[in-house]
Amino acid sequence: MDSRRSKVCGETACGFSTSSSDAKKRAASMRKLCFVVVLCLLFMSIEVVCGIKANSLAILADAAHLLTDVGAFAISMLSLWASSWEANPRQSYGFFRIEILGTLVSIQLIWLLTGILVYEAVTRLVQETNDDVDGFFMVLVAAFGLVVNIIMIVVLGHDHGHGHDHGHSHDHGHSYGERAEQLLEKSKEIRNINVQGAYLHVLGDLIQSIGVMIGGGMIWYNPKWKVIDLICTLFFSVIVLGTTIKMLRSILEVLMESTPREIDARQLEKGLMEIEEVVDVHELHIWAITVGKALFSCHVKVRPEAGDEMVLNKVIDYIWREYRISHVTIQIER
C-alpha cells in the first residue's frame, strides 16, 4: 500500500491573499486609469464638437471609440477594486478573475462599437452623400488627439516590465531568504491585465488618430477625396479589432485553464524527473487564476528510502526557483 502525503502552501490563502505589494500595484494602476479617464473625457468632448463641425465620420468614430474607452476603463477600475477583496471559504481563490471578466467585457464593447461604425461607413459609401468634409479640421483634431494618446500611452506603459510578483511569504518547510534577491531578478515581467487592456484601447486610438490625420490631410489637399474619410474609418476599424486579439487569447487561455505560455510543462516535468529521489511524475497540472498568477499540482512517486519532507522541499524549491510558482500542491507516492 502506498504511503501518501500532500503539502500545500502554509498560509490560508496561499498566494491569493491581498498582500501589501499587490495593494500598491493596484493603487498605482487605479491612479493611471483615473488619469486617462479624465483625458479621454476632455478630448472626447472636443472631438464630438469638431467632428460635427467638420462633418467627419472618422472623427466621430474616434470620439465614439473614446466613449467606449471611458466605459472600459471604468470596468477595469471596478475589477481592480474587486480583486482586492480577501479570499473566503466560498471564493477560496479570491476575486482575481474579476479582472479577466472585466477585460473581456471591455473587448466586447470595442467590437460592438466598431461594428456600428463600419455599418455607418458602408452606408455612406453606398448612398454616396454629397456632404462636404472639412479636411483642415480633421488634421487639427487628429494631431491634438495624437498628442493626447501619446501622453496616455506613456502613463499606462512607462512601467512595462516592472510588475514583478513579490508576494511570496509561504512556509514550504525551508527558507528561501538566502537567494531572494536572485529569484526576484529572474521573475517574469507581467503587467496588470486591466492596465494592459487600457493600453490596447489607447494604442487603437493612437493608430486611428494617425489615420484620421493622414486622411484629413488628403481631403484638405483635394476636397473631392472625401471618400477617404470613410475608407479611413473602415481600415482603422479593422486595425483596432486586431489589437484586441492577443488580449482575448490570453483571457480565453485563463478561462480554459491552459498552461501559461511562459511555462514549458514538458521541461518542468523533465526537471522534476532529474531529482535523484524521484521515480515518476504524473497528474501534472499547471494553470492560472489570472494572468501572472500560476498554480501547480502533481503526484510524485519517490524511492522507498527517500524522505517525504526532503523530496517535497526539493520539488517546491525547483518549481519556485525556475518558474516562480508559489502556489504548489504536491502529493508524494511510493
Curated annotation (Swiss-Prot):
GO terms for molecular function: metal ion binding; monoatomic cation transmembrane transporter activity. One of its GO terms (biological process) is metal ion transport. It is found in: Vacuole membrane. The chain crosses the membrane at residues 32-52, 57-77, 98-118, 136-156, 200-220, 225-245. The keyword Membrane applies. One of its GO terms (cellular component) is vacuolar membrane. Disulfide bonds: none annotated. Pfam families: Cation_efflux. Keywords: Ion transport, Membrane, Metal-binding, Transmembrane, Transmembrane helix, Transport, Vacuole, Zinc, Zinc transport. Residues 158-174 are annotated as: Required for zinc-binding. Belongs to the cation diffusion facilitator (CDF) transporter (TC 2.A.4) family. SLC30A subfamily. Involved in sequestration of excess zinc in the cytoplasm into vacuoles to maintain zinc homeostasis. This is Metal tolerance protein A1. It comes from Arabidopsis thaliana (Mouse-ear cress). The lineage of its organism: Eukaryota, Viridiplantae, Streptophyta, Embryophyta, Tracheophyta.
